[in-house]
Amino acid sequence: MIKHILQVEETKKIFEEIDDNEYEKIQDSRKNDDFIVDDDGYGYRDHGGEIWDRDGDVEEVGKKKKKKQNNHDPNENIMNYMMPASTLKKKSNAASTNPSAQQKPKVSVEQSRDIMNNLFQQLDAKDVDELEDVNEAKNMFVQEMNRPVAFNKEEDFNNRYSVTLESREEQERRRQSEQLKQQANIGQNQSDVNPFSKKRKLDEFQQVQANSYQSKQNSHSVSKSKPGDHEMANHADGVDLNLLAIDDTKMTDSHPSEIITQNQRASAVSSVNQQIMESTNGKNQLEKNDTEWQQMKEKNAVFNQDLRMNDNALMSNQQDYPLPLNEDGTLSFYWIDAHEENNGADLFVFGKIYQHEERKFVSCSIKVNGMQRELFVLPKMSGKSRAAMTTEEEKEQARKVMMELEGVRKRFPAITKWRCKPVTRKYAFELPIQHGEHQFVKIKYDATFPSLPSTVQGNTFECIFGANQSMLESFILKRKIRGPCWMTIRNPQKVTDFRRTWCKQEILVSNPKDIEITLDDLNKTELPPLTSVTFAIKTCRSSQNTNEIAMLSCIVNENISQEGPSKIDVHKSFTLLRKLDGKPMPIEYERAFRDKKDSFIQFFQHERQLIEAFVAKIYQLDPDLMVAHNLCGGMFDLLLARIQMLKISHWSRIGRLKKNQIPNKKSDQSGANYGGSQWIPRQVTCGRLLVDTFLTAKELIRETNYDLTHLAKVQLQKDRIDFDDDLLPTFYVQMAKLFQLIDHTEKDAYLTLQLMNHLQVIPLTKQLTNIAGNLWFRSLQNARAERNEMLLLHEFKKKKFVLPDKKQLNAKDLKKNMFADEYEEGDGKTKGGKRKKAAYAGGLVIEPKAGFYDNIILLLDFNSLYPSIIQEYNLCFTTVNRRPTKNFDGSEMKNQYKKGENGEEEVDIEEADLPDKNVNLKDAVLPMVLRDLVQKRKAVKDKMKTEKDHVKLSQLEIRQKAIKLTANSMYGCLGFGSSRFHAQAIAALITRTGRETLLRTKDIAENKLGFNVVYGDTDSIMINTGSNQLQQALEMGKRLKGEVNCLYKCLEIEIDGVFKSLLLLKKKKYAALKYENFLSPAEVKVVQEMKGLDMVRRDWCPLSKRVGRYVLDQILSGKQREEVVLNLNEFLSNIGNELKEGTIKLNEFIITKQITKAISDYNDIKGQPHVAVAKRLRDQGKSENQLVNNFIPYVICQQTYGDTTKSSTALSDKAYHPDEVISSRGKVTIDSDWYVSTQLLPPITRLIEHIEGIEVEFVAQCLGLDPKKYRYHSEKKNTDNPTDDPLIVSNPVLQTETERSLKNRTVAELNIKCPHCAHNYHFPGILVPSSNNTELTGLACVKCNQRIPDAYMLNRLNLFLKQLTALYYLGMKECKEPQCGMKTNQLLLNNKCIVKGCKGKMNSEYSELRINDTLRYLEGLFNVKKFLIENEKYRKKYEKPELVPNFQSFKELQKKVESFMIRSGYNKVDLGNIFGFMSKGANPHQQKMSIF
């Protein structure tokens, strides 16, 4: 046997053993080795230690680490950090006892001085700008580390641009003063040193170090007395003093001849500490606001442990559980959602069942088979009318129709069979079919066969109804399903193989009749709680200029109530975070994530991993609700785009229906799918409900802004900081900042959940769905028209009506339908583009009497005006006689359009008449539905009065609100063009009746009660009570309420608001102080209300918004007018002085505007300053991807060259980025004149336009402008004082009912100068009351009572009329812009102002309308007959006009005015011009007559 002997070779030593002396030599050699080439010892250096020594320092914690840190000088690290490495090497060599260090050759003092002098001479020979800061890179890094946290651009601008700009003269004066101070402080040793030299800088640097050490000692002594400030002091010494020491180059550049004294350095340190204190206070305030959030996170941290489990462990195998059947073999199923696929061939119902094994509700889906399509065919009439046909003739007609239909079926081989039979149905809609009962042929065939085209025509039938009806809609209507409810499922079959959904349980039903609505459920009586996942995301921009998901935080709540408020305090949360491309993560981020106990954070290297984890979490949690703010406005589209781009597997787990391919159609509402179910977010999430709090807030509350920050503030009383995705990379510098970002994202998700709960979105939309009978997901999408449509479909289906088909939309109509919510009733404009002119007039707007009212104004409003009109006059499709508007193919009838004046088509709607309101027709569906809703709401409100349980009271409040919303929106489906129940004739009739009702109310208020109506809009009026007593004003409102309400049965007006004071500017624009709780005197309080005054637009700078807000607050303050004027004078003067002195910070002038397309696509940038700035930034090296779709900040400036200032007229030449202004060093300064004239004066002018005692001239003078330019506007307002000029512009009270409608037009009043006493007065008319209760003739002077001679009066009137004619033919036009006021009689094109830069319109100063109004006014002054007709008192006294004093004189004066009126072409209506086209010899080129 051979043995193998193993020979082991002697191994080499892995570690080398040396003694202490040799190890110290190695360490010293490391310290002396400059391992950075050409660094000269100023950069990095090796401390000589080992790697494990540094690691131990990092990981060492507890008392041992603290003890080690206290053994050395606390300033040593700072000194070592700031001093060059060469200096540290010298210190180390001098202190070391290493012999090798002492063996180096010594350099004498003289040699050292020579070397240093040579170095300094070389440095002094260079210009200061050529010298580089050796610590520049380190300085930039420290600045980045210590930059204050900014979540949005506004905070970033405030941090960067919260500086005061100095003018060039101020800089020069400051430098001269500093040079004198420097010369006085320069010592003898430094008298020959160049102030720009490095030696000088080194001396200053070392002095700063000494001062910083002294400051360190002082701060330590302070910290002993105030332990709470220790952390702040350490922060100040450890960070900001570094910045002071490092930034020596910048200090020298700004102050070239300054020597930093100890006092100045101490002042600088004090200033820095003050800034730190302010920053710390702000941080403490923010932490105080977030205390509730942090406590909640800590409380819910234990629930997050479930989310840390393995994915497979979290998902148990629920599908193996048996179905929880009832004793009778049925299944109790709670309906939540439904969806159809393959054109209705596959119908899925989603809901929840109670799984006993799990002791909770789990998701379940039902695949419904056996659906049938139903079509109704209308036979064609020939000869006889339907009413005259006999039964046999109807049968023969039906037989012929069925024979032809069989031939039609054979043309479609996919439809193998169907069944037909004649039935009787009703019709009452817009096709040319007589309203009433008719015979139809009903067709039924299996839903797996394709649908029949609705355009099929035949010889024996007119059209086919129901061809494009979706199977889901048919299922809902036939099974009478009205929203989420319990169902009883008979014969359920559990699906185990080839499952089509991701639900925990899946069943199959062979016949839809096996599904029935049940009220008494055998399994569970309460409604199942819903599970919600509320998420918020943070995005970043990729190098390809695409949005990517960087962070995603979710709040999971498994107990969302369907009937009332939910308990959302208890929840789970998790955050998914990934690394940014090209951006390193902070040090030890993984351990920091693991140690974060109050949050569950998962980190991923790539976006793909993050999204896959999110999809997996959705599948595991199986939520019923997916909640986010602005979810449907781009967030979900982004998520799906990234899923498609990254090819995420099992992406359909976001929903509950299994799919292979992501749908690529944006929307397809023209198809048969219910509710436009081809919308992509709906396609991928069917089975789950999408809750977008942005959309629901727009539906449920009225706010000026619907972003999360504003809604959290006004609805939740919570502060939120806006976040700008462009600043996302700045948070990846430190873990503290990254945790702030994570916390911000998690809090966004929680605020969204709070908002959903506060607005009661889930219970309210459920009630709306239960009332209307539509799908819940459509109610969550604010499909108001669809809710009303489904409600009417249920009602008309119940009454055996043939339902109108869904309109087939083309691409153009589809685009309109997507923005259907932007349409207004009776208005022809949309946000998305143009459409035909308004088909009918909308609500009436009474012209406002603009001005400031310092007494109580009452706002009275009709309760649900349009629904009440429908009930009051019994308006319905079946009661209003109207002509048909559509052909059988669904197209509009041609007679619906006529040519307008501009050649465009206008809809010509027949004015329908009101039906007989005393006739009660049983088929009047609209009034019946509204009446039923009103009765239900009344019953709910009566129950609320006696209910004491807060939970039940909240549920009742939600139900009554849902009923109110449904009733108020019922009118909308009539005027909505895409609605199946579109009936413009009925809608026009309702709005016309509404206008008549408002006018009737106005007439009662003014003529019967003598009230002053100052404004009215659609269903409300404002009344000036003339009183400051609240109870007295309310009594006036009650009087009007009683007079109006007694005229109607259903219409009712109520006091809706009481304004203590009102600033009424124009239509839909006012501000007021409003009484709240005015019916309860003990609880009355005054709040400010604004409508239409938009002060948040980005094209107004912060200074403009601040000034406008102050002016408005002063006007509404209730102070005396003199005090308001003094306050405004002081405030505006201070603003003007600050602008002149340049003490306003730069961020107050910043205007932002978005770049919406590629910069090269902008053709003309002269009037677009943001584009000019963006173009300049692009030329400076910024990529276009960083500019497009971003908001560009800019300020308007003027350039300064020496003593001259260059100011261009083009805004593009005057616009600068804030960074450019700062770096210009005084060469570019703010153009204060532009800001005053463009940003400050216009908004102030609009606010004070109707305030007496405050003129534009006064405001311009306060702001430092030339008041002469604005004197015209002041004179234009003060026209009440008579002058020698007989033409005085004013608003006289006209004398006839016809002319009363003209009282808002300016006319020229007749002014008479008495020939006896030379007194000027307005001619008063026929008779005027005197002080002793006697009547005086208008031909007597109001002062001396002397009779005016007839010849003098006639001559004065003749001169007045000639001057009036001369003013008209002068053709003067004036600009309507307040700051322009240009007048000219030049011939203008498009009536645009001729002043360069002004965008105002030029209007005629004396137009034809104004001249005609003046003539009619004058004719009324001398018309005795008209005077007696209008004045009953004088009519009784003077039985005949001839008995009135001076009758002949007035008659002659009237003839003179009538002679001018006859000459006026404007006063005539030439019927020949109007109807001349009907005559054969008509001349189409007749010239228009002149006014005179």
Swiss-Prot record:
Zn(2+) 1 binds at residues 1314, 1317, 1341, 1344. Its EC number is 2.7.7.7. Residues 93-105, 184-194, 210-224 have a biased composition (Polar residues). Residues 34-112, 162-195, 210-234 are annotated as: Disordered. It is an enzyme of class 2 (transferase). Zn(2+) 2 binds at residues 1375, 1380, 1393, 1398. GO terms for molecular function: chromatin binding; DNA replication origin binding; DNA-directed DNA polymerase activity; nucleotide binding; single-stranded DNA binding; zinc ion binding. PANTHER family: DNA POLYMERASE ALPHA CATALYTIC SUBUNIT (PTHR45861:SF1). Belongs to the DNA polymerase type-B family. This is DNA polymerase alpha catalytic subunit. It comes from Sterkiella nova (Ciliate).
